[in-house]
Amino acid sequence: MLVARMQKMKAGNLSGMEKHNKRIFQNHSNPDIDTSLSDQNYDLMNREGKYKDIVTEIIESQKISQRATRKDAVLVSEWIITSDQAFFKNMDPNERDRFFQEATDWFKERYGEQNLAYAHVHLDETTPHMHLGVVPMRDGKLQAKNVFNREELRHLQDELPKHLREKGFEIDRGAEESERKHLSIPEYKKAMESVKELDVERQKKSQEIIKTVSQIDELQSAKSAL
């Protein structure tokens, strides 16, 4: 099953995302990252420079208005492209690389190669995945809401897996909810951790209830013995 999730990146998010995507850190809190494999990661766009400069260049080279870009504007719509571990298991590395290249080619064709800021493929985590950054420019304007409206999100969820199947990959469309709620990988992991915490909390409360019931039974037994 194809996983294609989007997150909106504003100016304040670019630096942190760049550090994550390029592995620019001395210490990290993600236990899923195996730093001994980080040198295998690569960027299919391979643009030089910092995200801020790359994105600014893409916007300024196309925009028709002289107005400054709003500080709260969505500068990048970042897509996380991946599948489950079963899809990648025993896959030839060349085929795996071709999978991400074909996905990138589809984005280039659909949204314009000039608007793709980066396409980082991560091979140093549990499941191979790609962070693909689209600067949502259209008709000389930065307009994330229009470029990725609900209709377009549905189109992407339908057509991207179709394209990949045509290229020889056995992959199905993602769940219907994919175009409604978009979670990044860290957000997904955080959500799963929250579920685990809730389960632990429920178990604790259940144990407390059982303990309380046992204490009541002991008191009643002691009272009956008097």
Language-model features, listed with the residues they occupy:
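N-terminal nicking endonuclease/strand-transfer module with a His-rich metal-binding environment
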Residues: M1-L226
